């Protein structure tokens, strides 16, 4: 009888350690959005941290074609800008043209008398930024010389010709008169006069064309003066010519006067180009020109400008992203990603945010999952989600505003004589790119750190808001979940989510259930030890009772034990 009583008590005590499924309680967990495969971004504290979503900030590819909408793009085809300006016969189609961007092709060539421009890059830049080849002829008077010289190397149709914007002056009869010509600028804009000097290949050619053994050209204004002497000598043959023409130019301001003095070798201007102040430019590119829309053009082709940085080309025209060395910079536009684990014990996937994120949330970044007498459910929290989104939205636009160029980065060219300047310019440009690349990475890592911190903060705010509502009616069980010690149906759960929960209504019930449950509840971690100890004690007591029974039976004679040797 004693043994039976002890076994019943032990069995009742062991069963009391097993949690009872009580419909008078509920579990509420808080969590955040997660995805199966997140995106790695860089922050100030971590080179690689996974987030639910990120936006690429570096444009690394072009369309492969130049868009002719948004800007007037002029295809130079077989002509360079300088050839078109001088009036090379095969470039006559470009006379009086206008452009925002003049595209020079690698296939461009000169098809007139061979020439050089001592300061080619500057003249090219002046004409390119002006955006027009508008030319105004002027009535220069050249007496005592023959005008409109031509060459077989520069044919217009079937006749010998020359650059249409220049006038090659040679001797008249057996003399070449000294020339003194003035041309005032009575207009209110700058005028660009292009002129040159001819360098014969031999002394015989010099006297044959200009009589004098050596000519001289002097062009002056109130602000400047240039005196050029011909450099007679043989040069490599180009289009059947060993001589050369050197091209110079003079800008005459309003109210100033152009003065030309020469006794031979003068390549005279026929008029002037109107200089305009503008944002037009020039670019070398072999990308085809197509009908499309883009505000940013590179030699590789047009690129979108919806990103703050680009790694396509240093040379750009239009409203373009800033060039950086990095091929990728990702801006976090979502929260820290903690993919959900498959096994979660008694509550399955209902574990809270401390353990994992929730995949499949479609109605918010933050939300609730619950388990009560009516089953399980999930719902997003609009308030905390919207607070996080409001802070993240606009980040990309703000970064673009900080970095987008509102001007173009022109090509820079230098003659061989200006090699040191070219090296210095290259060093300055490379340094600027290094600085911008560093600043871009720093900016992105700062923004990423801020995004992750604020999304974590919104999760904590939601948790604290829920804890303050529940007070003593629930217990924080340590994994982002609360155990609610009163019956909480779906309407009750909804009141917690929307902030209308009244803890006073459930206070007495919660306190009563808490004390009842706590009386028999054992903390996880001690249950196994107690069960094993109770099992061992039970076995020991059974053995003692069995041994006592055997001894009692032997004493009464009911059991006999024979030992044989």
Curated annotation (Swiss-Prot):
Major subcellular site: virion
GO annotation (BP), single: fusion of virus membrane with host endosome membrane
InterPro entries recorded: Capsid_hemagglutn (IPR008980), Hemagglutn_HA1_a/b_dom_sf (IPR013828), Hemagglutn_influenz_A (IPR000149), Hemagglutn_influenz_A/B (IPR001364)
Cytoplasmic compartment segments: 551-565
Disulfides per UniProt: 29-481, 67-292, 79-91, 112-154, 296-320, 488-492
Residue ranges of the TM segments: 530-550
Gene Ontology CC entries for this record: host cell plasma membrane; membrane; viral envelope; virion membrane
Lipid anchor positions (S-palmitoyl cysteine): 554, 561, 564
Topology term for the membrane: Single-pass type I membrane protein
Localization (cell): Virion membrane; Host apical cell membrane
Cited Gene3D superfamilies: 3.90.20.10, 3.90.209.20
Entry keyword set: Clathrin- and caveolin-independent endocytosis of virus by host, Clathrin-mediated endocytosis of virus by host, Disulfide bond, Fusion of virus membrane with host endosomal membrane, Fusion of virus membrane with host membrane, Glycoprotein, Hemagglutinin, Host cell membrane, Host membrane, Host-virus interaction, Lipoprotein, Membrane, Palmitate, Signal, Transmembrane, Transmembrane helix, Viral attachment to host cell, Viral envelope protein, Viral penetration into host cytoplasm, Virion, Virus endocytosis by host, Virus entry into host cell
Superkingdom field: Viruses
Annotated glycosylation sites: 23, 37, 53, 68, 78, 180, 300, 498
GO molecular function per UniProt: host cell surface receptor binding
Post-translational modification: Palmitoylated.
Extracellular side: 17-529
Quaternary data: Homotrimer of disulfide-linked HA1-HA2.
Note: Major glycoprotein, comprises over 80% of the envelope proteins present in virus particle. The extent of infection into host organism is determined by HA. Influenza viruses bud from the apical surface of polarized epithelial cells (e.g. bronchial epithelial cells) into lumen of lungs and are therefore usually pneumotropic. The reason is that HA is cleaved by tryptase clara which is restricted to lungs. However, HAs of H5 and H7 pantropic avian viruses subtypes can be cleaved by furin and subtilisin-type enzymes, allowing the virus to grow in other organs than lungs.
Chain's role: Binds to sialic acid-containing receptors on the cell surface, bringing about the attachment of the virus particle to the cell. This attachment induces virion internalization of about two third of the virus particles through clathrin-dependent endocytosis and about one third through a clathrin- and caveolin-independent pathway. Plays a major role in the determination of host range restriction and virulence. Class I viral fusion protein.
Family: Belongs to the influenza viruses hemagglutinin family.
The protein, known as: Hemagglutinin
Originating organism: Influenza A virus (strain A/Equine/Tokyo/1971 H3N2)
Lineage, top ranks: Viruses, Riboviria, Orthornavirae, Negarnaviricota, Polyploviricotina
């Amino acid at each position: 009888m004693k043994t039976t009583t002890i076994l019943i008590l032990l069995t009742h005590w062991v069963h009391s350690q097993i949690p009872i499924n009580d419909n008078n309680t509920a579990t509420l967990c808080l969590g955040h959005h997660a995805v199966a495969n997140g995106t790695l971004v860089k922050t100030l504290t971590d080179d690689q941290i996974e987030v639910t979503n990120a936006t690429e900030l570096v444009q690394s590819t072009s369309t492969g074609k130049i868009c002719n909408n948004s800007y007037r793009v002029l295809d130079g085809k077989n002509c360079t800008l300088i050839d078109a300006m001088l009036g090379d016969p095969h470039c006559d189609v470009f006379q009086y043209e206008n452009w925002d961007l003049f595209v020079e092709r690698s296939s461009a060539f000169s098809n007139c008398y061979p020439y050089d421009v001592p300061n080619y890059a500057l003249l090219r830049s002046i004409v390119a930024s002006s955006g027009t080849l508008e030319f105004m002829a002027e009535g220069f008077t050249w007496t005592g010389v023959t005008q409109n010289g031509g060459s077989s190397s520069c044919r217009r149709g079937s006749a010998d010709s020359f650059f249409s914007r220049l006038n090659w002056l040679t001797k008249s009869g057996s003399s070449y008169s000294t020339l003194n010509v003035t041309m005032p600028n009575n207009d209110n804009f700058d005028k660009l006069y292009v002129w040159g000097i001819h360098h014969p290949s031999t002394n015989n050619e010099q006297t044959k064309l200009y009589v004098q053994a050596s000519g001289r050209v002097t062009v002056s204004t109130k602000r400047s003066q240039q005196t050029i002497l011909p450099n007679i000598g043989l040069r490599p043959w180009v289009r059947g010519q060993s001589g050369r023409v050197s091209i110079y130019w003079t800008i005459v301001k309003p109210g100033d006067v152009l003065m030309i003095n020469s006794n031979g070798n003068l390549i005279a201007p026929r008029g002037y180009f109107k200089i305009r102040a503008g944002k037009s430019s020039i670019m070398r590119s072999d990308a085809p020109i197509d009908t499309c829309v883009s505000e940013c053009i590179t030699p590789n082709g047009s690129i979108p400008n919806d990103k703050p940085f680009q790694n396509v080309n240093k040379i750009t025209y239009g409203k373009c992203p800033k060039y950086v060395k990095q091929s990728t910079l990702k801006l976090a536009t979502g929260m820290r990603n903690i993919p959900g684990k498959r096994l979660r014990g008694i509550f399955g996937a209902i574990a809270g945010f401390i353990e994992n994120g929730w995949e499949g949330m479609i109605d918010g970044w933050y939300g609730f999952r619950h388990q009560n007498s009516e089953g399980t459910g999930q719902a997003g929290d609009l308030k905390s989600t919207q607070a996080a989104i409001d802070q993240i939205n606009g980040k990309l636009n703000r970064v673009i505003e900080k970095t987008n160029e509102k001007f173009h980065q022109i090509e820079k060219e230098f003659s061989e004589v200006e090699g040191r300047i070219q090296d210095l310019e290259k060093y300055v440009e490379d340094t600027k790119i290094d600085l911008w690349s560093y600043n871009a990475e720093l900016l992105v890592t700062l923004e990423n750190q801020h995004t992750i911190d604020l999304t974590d903060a919104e999760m904590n705010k939601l948790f604290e808001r829920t804890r303050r509502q529940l007070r003593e009616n629930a217990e924080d069980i340590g994994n982002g979940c609360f155990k609610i010690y009163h019956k909480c149906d779906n309407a009750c759960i909804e009141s917690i989510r929307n902030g209308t929960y009244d803890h006073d209504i459930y206070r007495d019930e919660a306190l009563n259930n808490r004390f009842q449950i706590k009386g028999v509840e054992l903390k996880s971690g001690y249950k196994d030890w107690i069960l094993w100890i109770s099992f061992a004690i039970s076995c020991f007591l059974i053995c003692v009772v069995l041994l006592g029974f055997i001894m009692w039976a032997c004493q009464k004679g009911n059991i006999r034990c024979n030992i044989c040797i």
